[in-house]
């Protein structure tokens, strides 16, 4: 009996000194919004217009409604009992389907997409927009988000290999629609991005993010392949992913991440490099 009591005492001592597992983020679907919730998120949740739009090429200087946007519908396929795995199916007006498997962890959300063109004709779906709203995260009231630029100093991307806060050098102000800012990777034609002001500088990688209102946390996101990085007009940030058009019968895989992590930039970059080795070669 004494031996058993000793074992039990040791077990409880270990339990006391071991940190509790960090609770997972959870997912919900509310209208066209993907909602990420967790006590670790400033403001308690992130809301994402998911997806805001599927887009055609030739979009940089084109009418957003009459040319660029391809209409689509979105269907909730399933949500796991623990609200950690959510599956969606998007159907584009031209017949393309996109299956989404979205998985929440303690400090990230993982996106795995399969786009397929079952039709006899080539699809014009070239890129798409997940629009992440960041008012609460950056310490502002969502009611004041319209065309707000007060959050810009909280936001960053990477230029010449260094974290660069917004507004970046050579901030553009002219475009079909203003305000906002677009950064186009070297691999993407500059004619095929958002019709907002296009910055002449090329980002060093595909990571874009911001610091929380108290500077203790970072939100960041990346996709592969990616079409653009974008600072929008309602306190939003985008890494918009590329489809590149799908031939008849073609299937493509796309993946993405949202990170919600402590404000350790070096640790974030190491994790990003592991998740997206294509971006750091």
Labelled PLM ranges:
Residues 1-5:
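Positively charged n-region of N-terminal signal peptides that target proteins for export
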Residues 6-16:
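Bacterial N-terminal signal peptides
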Residues 21, 78-80, 89-91, 179-281:
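Beta-strand-rich recognition/accessory modules
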Residues 21-76, 84-85:
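Acidic-aromatic substrate-binding/catalytic surfaces of carbohydrate-active enzymes
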Residues 58-106, 124-126:
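Extended, loop-rich substrate-binding clefts of extracytoplasmic carbohydrate-active enzymes
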Residues 104-160:
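Acidic (Asp/Glu-rich), glycine- and aromatic
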Residues 147-193:
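Low-complexity, serine/threonine/proline-enriched polar segments
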Residues 89, 101, 112-116, 131, ...:
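Residue-level recognition of well-ordered beta-strand positions that form the cores
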């Amino acid at each position: 009996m004494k031996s058993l009591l000793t074992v039990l005492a040791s077990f409880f001592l270990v339990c006391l000194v071991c940190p509790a597992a960090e609770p997972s983020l959870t997912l919900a679907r509310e209208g066209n919004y993907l909602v990420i919730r967790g006590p670790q998120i400033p403001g308690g949740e992130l809301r994402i217009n998911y997806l805001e739009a599927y887009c055609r090429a030739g979009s940089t200087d084109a009418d957003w409604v009459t040319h660029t946007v391809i209409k689509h519908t979105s269907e909730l396929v399933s949500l796991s009992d623990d609200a950690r795995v959510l599956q969606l199916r998007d159907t584009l007006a031209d017949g393309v389907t996109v299956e989404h498997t979205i998985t929440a962890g303690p400090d990230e959300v993982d996106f795995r997409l399969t786009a397929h063109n079952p039709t006899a004709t080539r699809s014009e779906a070239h890129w798409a927009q997940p629009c992440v709203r960041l008012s609460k995260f950056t310490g502002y009231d969502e009611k004041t988000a319209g065309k707000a630029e007060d959050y810009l100093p909280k936001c960053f991307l990477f230029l010449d290999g260094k974290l660069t806060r917004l507004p970046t050098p050579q901030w553009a102000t002219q475009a079909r629609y203003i305000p906002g800012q677009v950064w186009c990777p070297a691999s993407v034609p500059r004619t095929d991005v958002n019709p907002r002001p296009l910055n002449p500088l090329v980002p060093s990688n595909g990571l874009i993010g911001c610091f929380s209102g108290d500077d203790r946390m970072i939100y960041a996101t990346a996709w592969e392949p990616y079409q653009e990085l974008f600072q929008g007009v309602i306190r939003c940030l985008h890494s918009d992913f590329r489809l590149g058009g799908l031939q008849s019968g073609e299937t493509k895989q796309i993946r993405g991440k949202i990170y919600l992590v402590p404000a350790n930039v070096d640790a974030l970059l190491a994790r990003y490099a592991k998740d997206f080795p294509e971006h750091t070669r």
